[in-house]
Amino acid sequence: MIILGIHSHPGGHNAAASLLINGSLVASVEEERMSRIKGDSAYPAGAVAEVLSLGGLRAQEVDVVAMAGLACDKPQGLLADRVCHVIEHQLAHAASAYYASPFGDDRVGVLTLDGEGDASSGSAWVGARGCLRNVAYLPRHNSIGLLYAAVTRHLGFIAGRHEGKVLGLAAFGSPKPFLSRLAAHPHPGDALKDLCGDLPREDIAAGLQAFAEQQVCAWVQQQMAAMGVSKLALAGDVFANVKLNQRIQALPGVQSLYVHPNMGDGGLASGAAFAVHARLQGGLRPELAPVYLGTRIDRANALQALQKFDVAFEEPVNLAQAVAQLLAQGQVIARADGKMEYGPRALGNRTVMAAAHDPHINQWLNQRLARTEFMPFAPVILQEYASAYFPAWVAGQLAARYMTLTYDASELAKQHIPAAVHVDGTARPQVLGRADNPGYHDILTAYQGLTGIPSVINTSFNMHEEPIVRTAEEAIRTFQRAGLDALVLGPFLVRASAQ
């Protein structure tokens, strides 16, 4: 059965399309990557065309269209006459996490939290034997996501986009003053201006983060006890908060945690498709879904783009060793190769890399990429060394493969990769095994051989307020605009010094 999942509705964000073939997720792309409009909410015609192309299909071959959200747009064009099922917002989030998780036949607690969707701000489900059963919905007026967005806006940032900046800022403040005010007010969002008063914005951010952690962790524990589960699958924008996820993983009774890599509304398209498949087939056994599901950069289209832009390039016999040598020399290198990542995190295929031993590299990168961040850039680390740098990490913690939570850094990490460690002593690593991304792993292995350090900075390959690059042409343009030292484009190496 071929199911096309679509997320698109008026006033929404992160429209997307996903292709499910016989229960397996084979392609997923957000419309912003096609239109180059950050968080694009328009009907995802470009993303629909792209996932069908990636699947080698025509629109007429789609059996069912799965739309996410009760207020969704209708399928357009050649899809207008397809059978269409509409999936409620929180169910789509829950399905995205449950059916893409590695938990198989296990009993799982599936939790969703976001700003709002279809009049609710979260939900709890039991996942068992391939089916989801609802346990609870959270009303809109209790939304942690909306409160976080309101404070983000109050602090002068863009709500729905810059919550990560507030999270980074929180580490510089004292939580107590604002936390006590939030805890004492039954509906803090209604009196936000008065509650914030003249407090420094660092203290406001710190208090907000502490309040969110307290409220969400208490709710998670309550739901785990009610459901009798020790394994959790999470989705929804609130779970983009990596410090919150660290707290959840450390809760008593949490045996295993899976945070959906595309936890925000960009993941609703795949969730809707999963939910419809389970509805029509009487269930769907969860299986860990791939994270590289988008447009592919390969030798052919990389070469075509390089020739179009008249860019000087080389094709090293040992590309990984060549890149590692440049990194060891302090150069900053972008990598655009293979399939684009699914979700907001760069995981090696649309990535900017830099040595993390220089604490000033964050300032350099922020200037070149026109970013303003309060949290340092995240590291990627070879799996076999992860526990030495992040002692709480143990094999099998999937959330760390997708950079969806922070860890307390060891003294070794603070010495070797200070640029990746925040002022509060945490870092958000991508723990990389070779099977996850062989080419990326080879670069890191070669770098470790040269420097003795198994980790580098890994940040997304895009300019500030722009989507991550998708195509080879976009990679060349962004490389040139950012003034980076080198670009890995498929099997080719472009050096700025050679231009």
Q: What kind of feature is each model-predicted range?
A:
Residues M1-I3:
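Entry/capping segment at the start of metal-dependent catalytic domains
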Residues G5, H9-E31, S35-K38, L78-L182, ...:
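Flexible beta->alpha loop and helix N-cap segments adjacent to enzyme active/binding sites
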Residues R33-L57, V216:
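N-terminal phosphate-binding loop and adjacent alpha-helix
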Residues E50-I87, A95-A97:
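Short beta-strand-loop/turn "lid" adjacent to the catalytic site in phosphate-handling enzymes
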Residues R58-L70, M227-D237, I333-A334:
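Short glycine-rich phosphate-binding loop at a beta-alpha junction
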Residues S180-P200:
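A mobile "lid/hinge" subdomain adjacent to the ATP/sugar-phosphate binding pocket shared
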Residues D198-Q214, G433, N437:
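Short acidic-aromatic active-site loops that bind/stabilize oxyanions
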Residues G207-L232:
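Phosphate/ATP-binding catalytic cores across multiple sugar-kinase/actin-like superfamilies
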